[in-house]
Amino acid sequence: MKHIEYKPFFAALLALTVIGMAASVATLGVRADDNEAITFRTRLTGFGEVPPKLVEGSGTFSGELSADGQSMSWTLTWTGLTGPALVAHIHFGQPQNTGMPVVFFCNGGNRPAPCPDGPDHSGTLTGTFTAADVVAVPSQHVTAGDFAGFVKILRAHLGYANIHTMQFMGGEIRGQIRVGRGDEN
């Protein structure tokens, strides 16, 4: 029977794990590579909420980080809500968990109020996020104005967009934001 040396095997495995983790952390940087725009997207539905909601409403969010990493142009759309949108924002939270808002699309922060309400309780908002839009969330160690931190949250897939209504004050539709390049995601 052949004797196997486990120490070198586990040392190599540990080294590969550390290298892999370092590479993963390196991808959480803020800047786009060589002026290539980084996009963030999600589809909002009631199934994304915590707890999930069986509702007809849906929406989309898309954002594009500027080449210098200092701003993000964005569009948020929704339709079919149970009533007018009361507030819409991006939270810092994992899938299946909740967190606090870090930026607002409407009706909070320094965004216009109220949120638009069109036919079938629909709406579209466009704008640009900058450091001035990031609000403090002391319980999650987010500092007001920390745009680089906000982008790190999104790149780590720890941001979600959601829209609240009178019937669903905790949120009617939600989508976890993902990173994509170009038309991906």
Model-derived features: positions:
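Bacterial N-terminal signal peptides that target proteins for export
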Residues: K2-A15
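Bacterial N-terminal signal peptides
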Residues: A12-S24
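N-terminal leader/targeting pre-sequences
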Residues: S24-N185
